[in-house]
Design a protein with these regions (language model features):
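Zinc-coordinating Cys/His ligand positions in small cysteine/histidine-rich zinc-finger domains
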Residues: 281, 298-302, 318, 329
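His/Asp/Glu-rich mid-to-C-terminal helical/loop segments that flank catalytic regions of hydrolases
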Residues: 199-265
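Short cysteine-rich clusters marking metal-coordination/redox-active sites
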Residues: 273-276, 299, 310-313, 329
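Short functional micro-motifs and their immediate structural scaffolds
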Residues: 281, 285, 307, 318-322, ...
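Zn-dependent metallopeptidase/amidohydrolase metal-coordination segment
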Residues: 55, 65, 170-215
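Acidic/histidine-rich catalytic neighborhood of metal-dependent amide-processing enzymes
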Residues: 64, 85-164, 171-172
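Catalytic-core environment of secreted peptidases
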Residues: 48-89
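A non-catalytic alpha/beta surface segment that caps or lines the substrate-entry region
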Residues: 7-53
Length: 341
C-alpha cells in the first residue's frame, strides 16, 4: 500500500505548521531552486512558475483554521493523519503533492494562490492577468476531499471529463476552488482532484496518505505523457444553470466565504531565527536539523541562504557554510557509496 515514509510525514508536518505568509516565502525559495529564477513569479497573493510540461498544477496556501496545528499525529496502523487543532490538509495536502511531483524531476507549470478560503482572492487577482503559460493545455487543482473525485465545476467539456476519468477518477460536483476563476478567464479547462482529506473546515479533519499518494501517482502519469501527445482542452461553459452543480458566479459566495474572518496573526512572537536573529511567530519559521544534530529555525527570508534540499531523501538540511555545495544531507552522506551525482 502506498503511504508516507517517515521522511515524507516530516515534510508534510513542516508544510502544515507554517502560516500562509511563511509558506509563500518558503515556496518561492523552493521553486527558485528547482526552476530557473527568471521563470518564477510572485506577488502578495500568488506564485506561479513556468515549467516545460504544458499542464498547470494548482493549490492554495491558506486553511480555514485560526491557528496552525502544534500537534500532528499519524496513526500508522489506520494510515490516518490528524490534529486536535485542525489539520489544514485543505489545502496543505495539495501543496505537499505538488512539491513531491517537483522532487520527482517533473517540471509542470505551477500556481499557488492565497486566501482561497475567504473568497478566492489570489485566484481572482491572477485571473485578471493574461494567461502566463503560452502552451497551457489544461489545469489540475489538487484541492478536493475524498477518494477519486474529479470535479469540473462550470466547465462542460465532455472530452476533458472522459480523459480525466480514464486515469481512474469519477466525476462529482463541487462548489468552488481556484480554477473556478482561472478556467473561464483563461478559456482553459480545469479539474479538481481528490487528495484524501475528509471532514474539511473542522477540527475533525483528517488525511489518508494512501489516497494522497495514489493521486500523486496518477498525476505524474499524466505529466509523463510526451508533450506532443498531451491534448488541448478548452473551457466550455454550460449554456444553462444547474442549481447545486454550477459555481455561483455572483458575489454571494464570496460574502459567505468572508464570514470565516480568521486572524492568522494573533500568536505571541517567541522564536529566534538562526540566520538574522530576529523574533518571529512559531509558525513563521522553518525548522531544520542542523549540522550538530540540533533543530534550528530560519525565517522565510533566511531559508535560501541557509537551507538546501537533499536530492536523496528530499529533506531540508542546514548548509555547513555559505559556500557549501553539498546536495546530500549529512545522514545521506553517511550511507556507504552515497554519491551526489
Amino acid at each position: 500500500m502506498l503511504t508516507f515514509s517517515e521522511q515524507q510525514f516530516k515534510t508534510f508536518k513542516q508544510i502544515a505548521q507554517l502560516k500562509q505568509s511563511g509558506l509563500k516565502k518558503v515556496l518561492v525559495s523552493f521553486l527558485r531552486k528547482h526552476y530557473s529564477q527568471n521563470r518564477v513569479f510572485y506577488s502578495e497573493h500568488y506564485i506561479y512558475a513556468i515549467g516545460d510540461i504544458p499542464i498547470a498544477l494548482v493549490a492554495h496556501l491558506d486553511t480555514v483554521h485560526k491557528k496552525i496545528p502544534s500537534q500532528i499525529f499519524w496513526d500508522r496502523e489506520e494510515d490516518v493523519v490528524w490534529s486536535p487543532q485542525g489539520l489544514g490538509a485543505d489545502d496543505r495536502a495539495g501543496v505537499y503533492a505538488i512539491m513531491q511531483i517537483i522532487f520527482s524531476g517533473l517540471r509542470p507549470h505551477i500556481i499557488f494562490t492565497t486566501d482561497e478560503e475567504i473568497g478566492g482572492i489570489g485566484a481572482i487577482l491572477l485571473s485578471k492577468r493574461t494567461n502566463p503559460f503560452a502552451d497551457l493545455r489544461y489545469m489540475i487543482e489538487l484541492d478536493r476531499r475524498g477518494f477519486t473525485d474529479c470535479v469540473f465545476y462550470d466547465c462542460n467539456n465532455k472530452d476533458f471529463e472522459k480523459y480525466i476519468e480514464s486515469f481512474g477518477f469519477e466525476t462529482d460536483w463541487g462548489t468552488y476552488s481556484d480554477i473556478c476563476e482561472l478556467s473561464p478567464s483563461w478559456k482553459v479547462a480545469g479539474v479538481n482532484l481528490s487528495i484524501g482529506y475528509f471532514n474539511e473546515h473542522s477540527f475533525a479533519e483528517y488525511l489518508e496518505p494512501n489516497i494522497l499518494m495514489n493521486t500523486i501517482k496518477k498525476v505524474k502519469k499524466m505529466l509523463k505523457i510526451p508533450k506532443k501527445n498531451i491534448p488541448v482542452f478548452k473551457y466550455i461553459p454550460y449554456k444553462s444553470s444547474k442549481p447545486g452543480f454550477i459555481y455561483d458566479t455572483d458575489e454571494n459566495y464570496k460574502k459567505l466565504a468572508l464570514a470565516y474572518g480568521y486572524n492568522f496573526y494573533d500568536d505571541e512572537i517567541g522564536i529566534i531565527c538562526s540566520g538574522c536573529h530576529e523574533a518571529f511567530f512559531e509558525d513563521e519559521v522553518f525548522p531544520v536539523k542542523s549540522v550538530d544534530g540540533t533543530t534550528k529555525y530560519y525565517c522565510p527570508d533566511c531559508v535560501t541562504d541557509n537551507i538546501e534540499w537533499c536530492i536523496r531523501c528530499n529533506e531540508p538540511f542546514e548548509k555547513e557554510n555559505s559556500g557549501d555545495t553539498n546536495v546530500l544531507c549529512k545522514d545521506c552522506r553517511k550511507i556507504k557509496g552515497a554519491s551526489s551525482k
